Amino acid sequence: ATGEILALVTSPTYNPKLLVGKDRGKNYAQLFRDNDKPTFNRAIQAAYPPGSTFKPSQGLILQQEGIITASTMYPCHHGFVIRGMRVGCHGHASPLNLRPALTTSCNAFFCWGLRNMLNNRKYGSIANAFDVWKNHLVSMGYGKKLGVDLPFESRGFLPNSKYYNEHIKGGWNANTIISVSIGQGEILATPLQIANLCALIANRGYFYTPHLVKRIEGVGVLKRFATKRIPTIDPKYYTEVVAGMRGAVIGGTCRRANIEGIEVCGKTGTAQNPHGRDHSAFMGFAPMNNPKIAVAVY
């Protein structure tokens, strides 16, 4: 995955011919006032809860911080249940480790993982632990503009400890914010950021700034698009995440992405939508080894 954008699709769309000729001003005004916002490029400007497409990033962070290993097991009793609080999940084997947790998209596994990280005394405080968690995500391209060569890119949103100190009355703890572990709560990402995470995993530890223009005549390849960006995660921790995403396609939550003769790796996502039906998402890359393409659909 080289960062080259092969397709960037947003819907609803409009006929670009409307923006040429003598009526272009009137046509643009009509498009701008359209309630469906056809001029709004949702692929880079909209920010949505990433849902379970966020879980691979959590698997990487929890390994990097020594909270889990490939064999660490957490229980799931149709969800994460603690002190009267519940985050639901579906039926599958329990307990389970990281690989099947990704394959089955287990909510409880990642809730337990984040809770154990935030409550770990090595960080000194929950605020410090949360900011370590957040900084890993920033290094992966979340919570900031990736730098695509198009205007008006959104940075999405990642909260930090200061945000919670200011917005949660009476204080906060791991249980208060546990939904961020599964890509909900305050977490927002653009579809491009989700695709970029997938490219990072496909490359096992690096990504390039997403771009439409590869080279300019007389200038050559643009350096900022040819420079590897390396997050804070050791490359050895990608192995289990890739295996879990491959398992999701073979016999997990995204079997429809299985293509005969091509080893596809993928991750589905569902996120609550306060405005209507739940959001659905998918990210994937192929082939598993020597990958050529990464995709995200929201």
Residue ranges and their predicted role:
Residues 1-53, 57-298:
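Beta-lactam-recognizing serine transpeptidase/beta-lactamase-like catalytic domain environment
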